[in-house]
């Protein structure tokens, strides 16, 4: 089987192995592929593996040998899955491979906002502590999470894991989700506006849909406490970026930690890149080495199951 990986660079910059896929056939790896090069590079492929490249009906119709599309991701909005099904092409995704690492990044962003570790360390290494006359010296006040309220928007696997981390630190947990289920003791359901009003930290873990696009708008930001933080490891377009930048720069909320933006990479004039008390990381929450190794392993398992006539994780 000839396997083409169109954009393997983000999944594997060289620190993990493609061996699970190489065991299934001949593999050609491209770090990235421009849209106009997809057909040329995949023309002889029976299986195409991709992360962010867009595969339309038109492209699939130009790839007569294509039988399988393996997504190096959980989301599958980059592939026309309806067309794939009609053309007899199986599309498989990888659920749950990065739950823990995304939750870890959400808390890394939150803890940096609370403890200012990098800023305080830089000040200390710059001689600030040397000049002090006290044993304990800090250039930034610390924010304690114990007893505070964590609002979780979206209660899938990642949202549940973030809630557990918050509960372990003694936080009260408010949950908003379209689907209700039994909650652990000390968790409470909340309507969306009530959650924004009462939470000390709002953490977003919902998918991007027509319903959630722009969900965090000026009106909801105005509901938040001036001491509250917003964390987004979901999708950039869930947040109105201009409204969030205004809320940060005016002191309407205390800070934001973002791993996702509307445009990735961002435009140079993205207002959040210069916003006050805003930490931005380049969509890396999913990308721990362990998570990326799991991702490649599961894509290979998906392809092997397809070849054996028992496909798994099918989304087409």
Describe each model-derived feature in a short phrase:
Residues 155-156:
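Glycine-rich Rossmann-fold phosphate-binding loop(s) that bind the pyrophosphate
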Residues 54-60, 172-174, 178-271:
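Rossmann-like adenosine-cofactor binding region
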Residues 45, 63, 199:
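An anion/phosphate-binding loop that grips the pyrophosphate of nucleotide cofactors and donors
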Residues 1-45, 174, 307:
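N-terminal glycine-/charge-rich "phosphate-binding" loop or analogous flexible N-terminal tail
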Residues 31, 51, 72-73, 89-100, ...:
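Short beta->alpha connector loops at strand-helix junctions that form conserved
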Residues 87, 91-92, 227-316:
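Rossmann-like dinucleotide-binding domain for NAD(H)/NADP(H)
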Residues 159-160:
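N-terminal Rossmann-fold NAD(P) dinucleotide-binding loop
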Residues 87, 95-149, 315:
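Phosphate-binding beta-alpha-beta segment of Rossmann-like dinucleotide-binding domains, i.e.
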């Amino acid at each position: 089987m000839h396997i083409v990986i169109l954009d393997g660079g983000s999944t594997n910059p060289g620190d993990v192995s493609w061996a699970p896929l190489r065991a299934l056939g001949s593999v050609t790896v491209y770090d990235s592929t421009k849209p106009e090069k997809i057909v040329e590079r995949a023309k002889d492929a029976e299986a195409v593996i991709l992360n962010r490249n867009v595969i339309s009906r038109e492209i699939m119709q130009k790839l007569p040998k294509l039988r399988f599309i393996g997504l190096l991701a959980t989301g599958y909005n980059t592939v026309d899955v309806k067309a794939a099904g009609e053309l007899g092409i199986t599309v498989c995704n990888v659920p749950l491979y990065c739950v823990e690492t995304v939750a870890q990044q959400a808390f890394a962003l939150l803890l940096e906002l609370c403890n200012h570790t990098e800023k305080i360390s830089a000040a200390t290494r710059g001689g600030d502590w040397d000049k002090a006359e006290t044993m304990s010296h800090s250039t930034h006040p610390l924010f304690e999470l114990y007893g505070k309220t964590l609002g979780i928007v979206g209660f899938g696997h990642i949202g549940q894991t973030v809630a557990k981390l918050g509960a372990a630190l003694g936080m009260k947990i408010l949950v908003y989700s379209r689907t209700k289920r039994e909650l652990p003791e000390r968790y409470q359901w909340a309507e969306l506006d009530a959650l924004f009003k009462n939470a000390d930290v709002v953490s977003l873990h919902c998918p991007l849909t027509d319903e959630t696009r722009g969900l965090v708008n000026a009106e909801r930001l105005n509901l938040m406490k001036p001491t509250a933080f917003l964390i987004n490891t979901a999708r950039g377009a869930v947040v109105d970026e201009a409204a969030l930048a205004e809320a940060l720069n005016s002191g309407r909320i205390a800070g934001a930690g973002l791993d996702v933006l509307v445009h990735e990479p961002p435009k140079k004039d993205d207002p959040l890149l210069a916003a006050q008390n805003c930490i931005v990381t380049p969509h890396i929450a999913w990308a721990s080495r362990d998570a990326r190794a799991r991702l490649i392993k599961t894509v290979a398992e998906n392809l092997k199951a397809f070849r054996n006539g028992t496909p798994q994780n099918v989304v087409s």
